Amino acid sequence: MTQSQYSQTPRLALTDAIIDAKARKNLTFEDIAQGTGLSLAFVTAALLGQHPLPADAARVVVDRLELEEDAFFLLQTIPVRGSIPGGIPTDPTIYRFYEMVQVYGSTLKALVHEQFGDGIISAIDFKLDIKKVDDPNGGSRAVITLDGKYLPTKPF
């Protein structure tokens, strides 16, 4: 089963070990990527903590760099992407949600207030659903439902 990271910390530590082994063995990223069946750019990004590797590619990397066996499993996990810390999310998936709120946040606020009155949509009494559906024009679409309880502002 595919596993996902919730923190950059494990992958950052693994990246440090990879860079150390790469230097000790005097290898290039191209040397490490050979035999993985993946592009140099993808493998390099994965080694820097930005992508998961398929099991066969992870095995090649771990064996070539003589990494601990835990690295084999960690290289296959979906990382928290983004290598530049800051206030704005850098993970592409998370950033798209940030972008959506930047573009549609004021619209959502206006429509919530118009339809419900002064208040908020709860993120505590909340349900989230995501479905993958076919796009009639080809490919897939994500249908994301955010179902939060409306909480009116109470004068005091």
From Swiss-Prot:
The residues annotated as the active site are R96, E99, S122
> Which Gene3D superfamilies did the record assign?
Cyanate lyase, C-terminal domain, lambda repressor-like DNA-binding domains
Q: Which Pfam families match?
A: Cyanate_lyase, CYNS_N
Per UniProt, the keywords (alphabetical) are: Lyase
Q: What is its EC number?
A: 4.2.1.104
Q: Which GO terms describe its biological process?
A: cyanate metabolic process
Q: Which reaction does it catalyse?
A: cyanate + hydrogencarbonate + 3 H(+) = NH4(+) + 2 CO2
Q: Which GO terms describe its molecular function?
A: cyanate hydratase activity; DNA binding
Q: Which SMART domains match?
A: Cyanate_lyase (SM01116)
Record-linked InterPro entries: Cyanase (IPR008076), Cyanate_lyase_C (IPR003712), Cyanate_lyase_C_sf (IPR036581), CYNS_N (IPR048564), Lambda_DNA-bd_dom_sf (IPR010982)
Q: What class of enzyme is it?
A: lyase
Q: Which family does it belong to?
A: Belongs to the cyanase family.
Record's function text: Catalyzes the reaction of cyanate with bicarbonate to produce ammonia and carbon dioxide.
State what protein this is by name. Answer: Cyanate hydratase
Species of origin reads Photorhabdus laumondii subsp. laumondii (strain DSM 15139 / CIP 105565 / TT01)
Q: Which gene encodes it?
A: cynS
